[in-house]
């Protein structure tokens, strides 16, 4: 007797077999091979090898009025409950069975195990003919000529893998045929199916080369197979010859896979089918491999399936991975689902009956639809688990697991009902019927028809409380057309359909693009390009960050920025953009374009200026305000702050690169500042004034486009007040000596520039704003202050240029008051055409306090720049400009 702790047991989700012979008689075709490979074997935990022979049982089930048979292997001693003596818990398979069967889905859960002895005994029965008999029903939609290519590919794969075994002991050829079957169930074209058959031939054998595949089946098949296998083979060679870690090699493989799928989407579709079958047979791998593969599937492949809209594959990958990664949590969730369903089974049945009756009695639907199906659907186990984690409560306390009813309508052709009745209008009509019966819960109606998800998903969602039998439970109702339902399940795969036209899936019959062999490929379809637009981001990142990002960083960027939870926002033109949850307006700016992010000075959300730290929420309208004339140093300082607010790795990498570029442009100035700071911090006794940096400040044309250059006069440059008592005059900035000071004539056009943390001291009798700000000139000219040395010098005015937004004057004055700056008066003018505002404050302050306050004014939301100034006495003819 084999001990419980050494048994290899798994839970199997067996798809109900409804495969036909292909002879038109709709006879069921079920064999040990066809059902066994299709069945996902999901481990409940603690696998170990066993020599105990399985006992085969035959079950009968009905679907759509037809009976079919399926064959599986079950352990007699453990019919319902599987326990492990060394394990801290028991897996309750009874609840798993109950939850799956009660949901009315298309799957049944059974105990399943395959031993090496039984599979090796069956290997002699595997021939090309038996494999073709099992594969043909799933690809019978292909034309005869294309079926010949598939059969040719099967023979080639059979020869290449002859004599090879899987870990389970079964012939290796079963795996590629199973992958081809999965692709056939998605009704993909023959190139994809042949690539599925050959995807391991180059990697695992020396019999097949890429050149041979191209010669036999064309460049498209070679490209797909190459994307599947070539990189993995190189990765294996690296492991043997180099000192790289397994994680680095795996990251490099994933990076190459991501890049390959940007050129050919079918690379990832075949890869998903390959991973799905590997997950279904993962029970034969060692426990540490199971955990690693399942974790990678949850992190990379399931989110990729979601991005492609392939929800059927995504759901199965998540649930299978969940059972391997956390068997205890899986058991608790399934038990909770079963208990909740038992509590509300009566109400759900009654709600279904009421809704069906309402639809049957509606005359409009009878006129415009062929038929309407109402299905009872269970939420996926893993999605419920994530919702429970989000609520930060125990799964046993989580009661908001909404049961689902899915309404799928099949409209009549538009010729029969007229152009005024579109499929979308029928869906909205059904939504109205649902709300006539039950009132919707506020903020639960989601219209994915008007605003589809980026992967093409379309449906109407609403959540109601039926109030039946004095019981309250949430009932989610989904409404979609037959075409929408097909796209929701298969996603991007419908655009590689094996038929000549994609009929009705995107509105009308759309002739698809053609590949090298003249087969339909949909590469020129606008909807297709829209649904895989996120692939462009991967390609752009590779081009932008080549040499600056390791493979592990690149893969981490993709998994976090693309494959995580998303939020959907709108551009001002109504385009939908999706970003990772928690992204800020800084991330949005760099998502639109790198140059937009580099030139960003402010952002508006729903028409209101917001802080760069603003976290985006669903359905917000985001607008980025850019400015082309920011100085290098000002841009450097702003983006250095924004680096802290960027949440996506891609935005952070772009900002880092921008900072390096800006640092190179103003390297001399930055180096000089760093030297001066170091000397000041070291309490040096050197009191000599340092020479100013060589930076050439840009003319701020957009703000002062009409300011006239001043007439140059023959003035001496050495008009700085002489130091008193023979002392060396060296003003302090922020308490530090030896800051760079520039003494320049007033004829230099450098009197108003964006704030960069350096005070600019200007004479008041220069009409700087005469052309653009006439109201300020006379006000300022009447204010004359006196320049004093070191501790006694005074500042006369402060000019702040900002975006025109409500409350900005109050915020700036609050900052000034908080720093103890005395305000004598203030005027402001607005340029509504450009959305700019200029504020001019008459103040009393010294250099130390002014430099400190200007640095804080620069951080006020919407401030683009500032400039400060003073004046010499009127008796002084040689007006000078001092910058410190």
Curated annotation (Swiss-Prot):
Region of interest (Disordered), residue spans: 711-747
Cysteine pairs bridged by disulfides in the record: none
GO CC annotations, alphabetized: chloroplast
Chain's role: May be involved in a rapid plant ppGpp (guanosine 3'-diphosphate 5'-diphosphate)-mediated response to pathogens and other stresses. Unable to functionally complement E.coli relA mutants.
EC number: 2.7.6.5
EC top class named in words: transferase
Any coiled-coil regions, as ranges: none
InterPro entries for the chain: ACT-like_dom_sf, Beta-grasp_dom_sf, HD/PDEase_dom, HD_domain, NT_sf, RelA_SpoT, TGS, TGS-like
CDD domains to which the protein is assigned, alphabetical: HDc, NT_Rel-Spo_like, TGS_RSH
Keyword annotations from UniProtKB, A to Z: ATP-binding, Chloroplast, GTP-binding, Kinase, Nucleotide-binding, Plastid, Stress response, Transferase, Transit peptide
Catalytic activity: GTP + ATP = guanosine 3'-diphosphate 5'-triphosphate + AMP
Gene name in the database record: RSH1
Biological processes, Gene Ontology terms: guanosine tetraphosphate metabolic process; leaf senescence; photosynthesis; response to wounding
Name of the protein this chain belongs to: Putative GTP diphosphokinase RSH1, chloroplastic
Domain ACT, first and last residues per copy: 797-868
Known partners and oligomeric status: Interacts with RPP4. Interacts with RPP5.
Xref: Pfam families: HD_4, RelA_SpoT, TGS
Further facts: In the ecotype Landsberg erecta, RSH1 (AC P0DKG8) has been shown to interact with RPP5 (AC O04264).
Species annotation: Arabidopsis thaliana (Mouse-ear cress)
Domain HD stretches: 172-279
């Amino acid at each position: 007797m084999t001990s419980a702790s050494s048994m290899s047991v798994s839970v199997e989700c067996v798809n109900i077999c409804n495969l036909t012979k292909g002879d038109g008689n709709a006879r069921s075709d079920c064999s040990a091979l066809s059902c066994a490979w299709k069945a996902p074997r999901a481990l409940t935990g603690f696998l170990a090898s066993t020599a105990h022979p399985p006992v085969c049982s035959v079950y009968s089930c009905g679907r759509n009025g037809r009976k079919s048979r399926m064959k599986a292997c079950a352990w007699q001693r453990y019919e319902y409950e599987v326990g492990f003596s060394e394990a801290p818990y028991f897996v309750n398979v009874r609840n798993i069975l109950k939850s799956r069967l009660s949901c009315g889905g298309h799957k049944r859960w059974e105990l399943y195990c395959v031993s090496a002895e039984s599979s090796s005994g069956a290997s002699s029965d595997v021939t090309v003919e038996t494999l073709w008999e099992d594969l043909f029903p799933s690809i019978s939609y292909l034309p005869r000529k294309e079926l010949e290519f598939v059969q040719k590919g099967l023979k080639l794969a059979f020869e290449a893998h002859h004599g090879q075994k899987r870990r389970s002991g079964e012939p290796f050829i079963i795996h590629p045929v199973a992958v081809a079957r999965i692709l056939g169930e998605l009704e993909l074209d023959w190139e994809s199916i042949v690539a599925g058959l050959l995807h391991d031939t180059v990697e695992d054998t020396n019999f097949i080369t890429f050149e041979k595949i191209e010669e036999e089946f064309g460049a498209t098949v070679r490209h797909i197979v190459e994307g599947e296998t070539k990189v993995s083979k190189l990765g294996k060679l690296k492991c043997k010859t180099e000192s790289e870690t397994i994680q680095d090699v795996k990251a490099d493989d994933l990076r190459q896979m991501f890049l390959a799928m940007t050129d050919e989407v079918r690379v990832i579709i075949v890869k998903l089918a390959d991973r799905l079958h590997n997950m279904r047979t993962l029970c034969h791998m060692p426990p540490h491999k199971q955990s690693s593969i399942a974790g990678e599937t949850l992190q990379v492949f399931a989110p990729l399936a979601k991005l492609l809209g392939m929800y059927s594959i995504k759901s199965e990958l998540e649930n299978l991975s969940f059972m391997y990664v956390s068997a205890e949590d899986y058991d608790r969730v399934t038990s909770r689902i079963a208990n909740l369903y038992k509590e509300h089974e009566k109400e759900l049945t009654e709600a279904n009956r009421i809704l069906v009756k309402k639809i049957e009695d509606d005359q409009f639907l009878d006129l415009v639809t062929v038929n309407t199906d109402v299905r009872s659907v269970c939420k996926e186990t893993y999605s419920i688990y994530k919702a429970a984690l989000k609520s930060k409560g125990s799964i046993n306390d989580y009661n908001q697991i909404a049961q689902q009813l899915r309404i799928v309508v099949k409209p009549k052709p538009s010729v029969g009902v007229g152009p005024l009745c579109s499929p979308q209008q029928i869906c909205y009509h059904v939504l109205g019927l649902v709300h006539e019966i039950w009132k919707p819960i506020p903020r639960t109606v989601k219209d994915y028809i008007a605003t589809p998800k980026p992967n093409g998903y379309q449906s109407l969602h609403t959540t109601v409380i039926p109030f039946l039998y004095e019981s309250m439970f949430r009932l989610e109702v989904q409404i979609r057309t037959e075409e929408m339902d097909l796209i929701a399940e298969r996603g991007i795969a419908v655009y590689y359909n094996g038929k000549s036209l994609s009929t009705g899936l995107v509105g009308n019959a759309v002739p698809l693009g053609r590949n090298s062999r003249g087969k339909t490929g949909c590469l020129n379809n606008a909807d297709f390009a829209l649904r895989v637009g996120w692939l462009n981001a991967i390609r752009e990142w590779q081009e932008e960050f080549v040499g600056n990002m390791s493979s592990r960083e690149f893969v981490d960027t993709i998994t976090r920025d693309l494959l995580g939870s998303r939020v959907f926002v709108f551009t001002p033109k109504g385009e939908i953009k999706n970003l990772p949850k928690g992204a800020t307006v800084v991330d949005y700016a760099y998502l639109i374009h790198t140059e937009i992010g580099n030139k960003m000075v402010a952002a508006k959300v729903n028409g209101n200026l917001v802080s760069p730290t603003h976290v985006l929420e669903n359905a917000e309208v985001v607008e980025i305000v850019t400015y082309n004339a920011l100085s290098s140093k000002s841009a450097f300082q702003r983006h250095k702050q924004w680096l802290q607010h960027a949440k996506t790795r891609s935005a952070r990498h772009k900002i880092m690169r921008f900072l390096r570029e800006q640092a190179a442009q103003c390297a001399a100035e930055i180096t000089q500042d760093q030297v001066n700071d170091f000397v000041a911090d070291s309490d040096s006794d050197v009191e000599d004034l340092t020479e100013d940096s060589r930076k050439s400040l840009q003319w701020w044309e957009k703000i002062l486009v009409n300011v006239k250059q001043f007439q140059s006069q023959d003035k001496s440059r050495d008009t700085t007040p002489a130091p008193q008592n023979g002392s060396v005059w060296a003003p302090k900035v922020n308490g530090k000596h030896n800051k760079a000071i520039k003494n320049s004539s007033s004829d230099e056009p450098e009197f108003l520039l964006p704030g960069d943390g350096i005070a600019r001291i200007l004479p008041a009798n220069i009409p700087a704003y005469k052309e653009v700000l006439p109201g300020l000139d006379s006000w300022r000219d009447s204010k004359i202050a006196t320049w004093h040395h070191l501790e006694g010098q005074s500042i006369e005015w402060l000019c702040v240029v900002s975006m025109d937004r409500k409350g900005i004057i109050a915020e700036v004055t609050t900052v000034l008051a908080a720093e103890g700056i005395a305000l004598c008066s203030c005027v402001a003018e607005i340029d509504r055409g450009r959305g700019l505002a200029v504020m001019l404050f008459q103040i009393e302050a010294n250099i130390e306090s002014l430099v400190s306050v200007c640095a804080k004014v620069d951080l006020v939301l919407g401030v683009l720049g500032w400039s400060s100034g003073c004046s010499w006495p009127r008796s002084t003819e040689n007006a000078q400009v001092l910058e410190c």
